[in-house]
Structures are given as C-alpha cells and as structure tokens.
C-alpha cells in the first residue's frame, strides 16, 4: 500500500471514531424531561376526552348531598315526633303556629315511615266507612293529608294542628268547633299523641251522636305491657267509663291495633273518676 493510501485509510478510521453509528439493538436513553413531556401529553389527551389519569373514588356530589339531606331530615323528624308525644295538644299547636314548615317536615318523615308498613291503618278505617252508609258524618281527628276525606263520599270534618288546604281545620283536637252530638263517626288514626290524649277522646264523645262510632287505630307497641306499653284492658275500661261500649278489639295486625267503640244512648248520672293509662310514646331509633 502506498503512502497516500495509508494516509487516506487512517483518515477514514478517525472519522468513524468521531461519528460512531448507534447500534440498532442499543436503546436510546430517555431523560426525565422526556418522561414528563410524555406524561403531560397523556394527561392532556385524557382531559380532552373527558377522562382522568386516576379514577376518582369519591361519591357523586348529588348522591352525597341527597344522603346528607335525608339524614338531616330523619333527625328532625325524630325530634318532632318525640315532641308531639311528650307535650300537650295546646303546646304542639303553638309550636307549629310559630314555624308551620316544621309540620311539613314532620309529615314528610311520617310518610317515609309509613312506606315501610305492609298495611296502613288508615285503609282499614276507609274500608269500614265504605262498607257503611255514605250519609254518616265523620270527624277525623289528626287527619294528616286528609286521606279519609279524599277517599270516601261522606261529609268529613278534618282536624289537625296545621291547615295546608281549605278542607283541613287547624285546631287543638281537645277543643274543636263542632257542635255537640253533631257527627256519626269519630276517627283517631295514629293520632293519640299528646300527653293529654284523654281530652281528645272526651271531645270525640261530646261531638258524637248517641250510638255514634269511635274508631281508633294505634301503634301496637303502645299497648304491649311487657315492653312498657299500656295494658289494652285498662285503656278499653277507661273509654267505656267515659260513656262507650266496646265493639271490636283487633290485634291481628303486626304493626297496629284497632279499637271500635259505640257511644251509649244514655249517660249514667253518677260520674266516675276515670283512670286513664299512660300510653307509651312511639319513638323512632336512629338507623
């Protein structure tokens, strides 16, 4: 090889050493900067498609707020329910006069509780009325949403602590505006709640005609003497001492008990001292 050829060969070797070709099998290093750029590109792509780089485990806001509202509503219902069972009718009337919205809140909670019952006592009373003459005049003490008046053709006087429609008369149920001996049927459907419940029954006796019917539906646990409730025999005796005769005692339902009484034609001249049993308050536990 000539001197020129050797020189040219050495130059080619130096050039290859200065600019080596990368091996096809050798991985090209990725710098942290490149990794961050790729992550940012992925996050941007996810955001553009409504996605997220990590799935959220939090509940949907609407579901959370609904659950919170339901919990607050349930707590307020329990508070109002306890108040109604532990105060007089006059005190309850004054309370709801100051804040009528509390009455709406109570009845919303009440309807939720009733939705868990397999059978509603108001339907038993409605069926009784439908099976009798529509000419009977009815007084519904503690009418709630006035379902009885909406379900029968009878003339119905609907009483409750607050009136939300013209057909309901707001009053203390121990002192209604009805004339004496003016109605044929008096109804108490889960409404003997005040500490002075006996005065409600006395008012029903006043407004009923002779031979008029008194229909009472109450929570069964209130008449369970083994668990702090009243003895139903004592309750029936007190009502009969007031001037009624017992017609029906129905314990067959799991949730409520039915009493039917008839007003006596004539009252005894000797007034008895009536011993009214204390009815157990029906309080709902927090779930």
Swiss-Prot record:
Residues 9-21 have a biased composition (Basic residues). Probable methyltransferase required to silence rDNA. Belongs to the methyltransferase superfamily. RRP8 family. Its EC number is 2.1.1.-. It is an enzyme of class 2 (transferase). This is Ribosomal RNA-processing protein 8. Keywords: Chromatin regulator, Methyltransferase, Nucleus, Repressor, rRNA processing, S-adenosyl-L-methionine, Transcription, Transcription regulation, Transferase. PANTHER family: RIBOSOMAL RNA-PROCESSING PROTEIN 8 (PTHR12787:SF0). GO terms for cellular component: chromatin silencing complex; nucleolus; rDNA heterochromatin. It holds the Pfam family Methyltransf_8. Residues 1-62 are annotated as: Disordered.
